[in-house]
Amino acid sequence: SGNPVVMAAGMATLNILKANQDIYEHINKLGEKLQNGIEEIAREKNVKLTVNRVGGMMTVFFTDRNPVRSYDDAKSCDLEMFKKYFLHMNKNGFNIPQSQFESMFLSAVHTEEHIDKFLEIFKRFQP
């Protein structure tokens, strides 16, 4: 959009990111912790799951494919299990994407405490 307010907000965001390069390291570190935690909990529960992640952007797929590489791969995942996961996380205060065809995103304001809480709630998920 060429809206002046949107352009100003975009420029302000870029200036903040340029001045605070450590934001990327922070987001990547949190993303890695979240991915590892989700995968570890899934192994403990014997749940077939993989997490596709780039930095702080990720999607949980209920499948034994690793990684999920295509739309056809994603369609073959357990969509009912994803629905249960979504409802569980949402009911417990985490507004994650309602479809495994979307990604969740971490941001600079997320903390290790947020990740720990997410993993605590995910651990209580009953597939």
Question: For each predicted feature, which ranges?
Answer:
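Conserved N-terminal phosphate-binding loop of PLP-dependent enzymes in the Aspartate aminotransferase
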Residues: 1-127
